[in-house]
Amino acid sequence: MLKSLNARAVSLVTWGIEHSEELGLLTEKHPTGATLIDLGIKAKGGIAAGRFMTEVCLAGLGKTSVTTMSYEDVALPSIHVETDFPALATLGSQFAGWQIKTSDYFAMGSGPARAIALKPKELYQKIDFSEKSENAVLVLEADHYPTEEAVKYVAEECETTPSKIYTLVAPTSSMAGSVQISGRIVESGIHRLTELGFDPKKILYGCGYAPIAPIHPRAAKAMGRTNDAIAYGGVTFYSVDSDDDTKLKELVHRAPSSASKDYGRPFYEVFKAASFDFYKIDPGLFAPATFAVTNIRTGVTHASGKINPTLLKQTMQLVPA
């Protein structure tokens, strides 16, 4: 039987604290007693910190590596992610599905603490999973450390004390932040297939890669680039067990970002046109550029989508020397 998600993540976090100098992390005790790990606010962070953050988000049930990939005539650093526990690692842990919202703080939360608090409950019902754990590991995309009120809220939702909370935090406009968002490539595809009606428990294996967006000092621009990295450069592969190959083919056809009505412009432009309201954006845009899904019952691989180097160059402001 697998060790609990939070127990696995605590083991990783403990290792990270021991190697904080190599990873460029800063660790301190929060006023509430929680353990705070900074990967890019005051800390230097970096690519290794981003990989570490990604693997903590996956609760140790996925592996990452960074290499350079060619997107037609453009070569970009890219993160590769793989997992043999796709639904549990991604939807059960990595998915940024918890809004940490108090009177003095806001951030999107991911990581295995979600499995204790069941955020969101409907998603955990789909994967038939929940967890009880004294320790809780939460990853925040934020420009500021969580406030005392925010940490106490998390502890209350996880039915534990603040001293048992481990919080990792990095801004989108940091190297670690950019790496870990591109590191959601496999998760974004699984979430999209799930939203289209596929049972995530039937996904047996997942891997993929996406370019790591160059850092932009403006948070909104950085967020746009990181979303574009997945939507216009993200490549995914899955093995599934489906008894309906015709339906699977239809779902895969609808899954890539190119099927979205908002496809074809940098995300920042789409976001701005939507008055910076995520809920006005077609959910189909939050998907990888390509899918390849093999049905182990038939041996058929259904493929869809396309890489868009032109949009990648535009959003990342790649200017020839």
Where are these regions (language model features)?
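Anaerobic metallocofactor- and corrinoid-dependent redox/one-carbon enzyme cores
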Residues: 1-158, 163-187, 191, 195-321
